Every structure is written in C-alpha cells, then in structure tokens.
Swiss-Prot record:
<dbReference type="InterPro" id="IPR009364">
    <property type="entry name" value="YdaT_toxin"/>
</dbReference>
<dbReference type="InterPro" id="IPR037042">
    <property type="entry name" value="YdaT_toxin_sf"/>
</dbReference>
<protein>
    <recommendedName>
        <fullName>Regulatory protein CII</fullName>
    </recommendedName>
</protein>
<comment type="function">
    <text>May be involved in activation of synthesis of the CI protein.</text>
</comment>
<dbReference type="Pfam" id="PF06254">
    <property type="entry name" value="YdaT_toxin"/>
</dbReference>
<keyword id="KW-0244">Early protein</keyword>
Length: 132
C-alpha cells in the first residue's frame, strides 16, 4: 500500500516530499509521517500533502469511512457493492441472519440515492409488496 501511495503522489505531480528509491526506506519515511510520534507540525503538513494520493489509492469502503462521499458516483458505487453482496448471500444460501443483514444493507444503500424521498419510496415499495 505504501508503494501505491508514493507512486500516486509522484504521478499527481507531488514534489514537496522526496522519497528514497528503495521501497523499504520510502515505506519507513511514509510511516514516520503517518505515525507522527513527536507531534511534528512538518509531519502533519506532509500528511496533508499526501492526503490526495492516499485517498486515491484507498479502496472505496475505507475511503468513505475516512471522508464520507455524498456525490452521486460514490453513492451508486456503494449501492452496487451492497446489492451485489445481498445477491451473493442469497445465491450462496447464506445463513438467514447473514441474508437479512446483506439485503437490508442493499435496501438502505438504494434509499441513500434519494434521501429526500425515503418516505414516498417506502410507501411505494410496501404497496408494491402488498403489505399495505
């Protein structure tokens, strides 16, 4: 992961921080910045400088935990992931509690696509299912 961060930083045109070519030494330098054991302002600034590269290489599920994305593409990506996991749970005949968890997460992720319309959507869905 550290090599990905460093390479992405360089590809984004980052020049304020120099990293050694040896990946072990570069990794050590990166982790010193992130750990910041001595509460250094310079290390904090280095992490700020590296943040776009770090966010670019993180998997979506970790990225949204650090900085929740409310843009349409992130919401759609999340909905696709959650619905895919729900379908897998059903196809693989997972235990009932696992299917319930995955399906409910999929449904919630779809509602997040239109948060201002959750009430009307709930009404429509329940009437389509014949619950009302």
């Amino acid at each position: 992961m550290s090599a990905l961060i460093i390479n992405e930083y360089r590809e984004q045109g980052g020049t304020a921080i120099s990293f050694p070519e040896d990946i072990s030494r570069a990794r050590q330098k990166l982790f010193r910045f992130l750990d910041n054991r001595f509460d250094s302002d310079q290390y904090r600034e280095n992490v700020r400088e590296l943040t776009p590269a770090i966010m670019a290489v993180l998997p979506v599920e970790f990225r949204t935990r650090l900085a929740p994305q409310n843009d349409t593409m992130s919401l759609i990506a999340s909905a696709m992931k959650e619905c895919s996991e729900a379908k897998q749970a059903v196809l693989l005949n997972a235990p009932e509690h696992q299917k319930m968890k995955e399906v409910s997460e999929g449904i919630a992720s779809l509602f997040r696509l239109m948060p201002e319309q959750v009430g009307p959507l709930m009404t429509m869905v329940t009437s389509m299912l014949g619950v009302i």
